[in-house]
Amino acid sequence: GGAVSNSFTQTFIARAEDIDELGHVNNTVWVRWVQEIATAHWRAVAAPEHVDAFVWVVTRHEIDYRGNVGEGAEVTATTYIPGRPHGARFDRCVDFHDAAGKLLVAVRSTWAMLDKAS
């Protein structure tokens, strides 16, 4: 029954400043969106005192670019935790789909939890 908080969805709109010289969303923007949805998911499910006490940092990104979109396109990102945490580390997956449901970008990241005080 606890799987509900394991998944989180957010929509992004490709803005003019997100677009590269090829007319598509820049690769670095997808990484930024990964960090934005990860932060939103953490804030949505974590206790406030944990949000205040800890910060997550990325130690690894594995990214498959399968498609892309242009300016004004709406992209739906779904993030989920595929396994159990390993101590203060865990993997997070983020899948980005276009309006038609086509998988555009698939990301698997490793995150480490740090104490904000340190």
Ranges and model annotations:
Residues 4-10, 65-74, 81-118:
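HotDog/MaoC-like acyl-thioester-processing domains
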Residues 59, 76-77:
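Short Pro/Gly-enriched beta-strand edge/turn motifs at strand-loop
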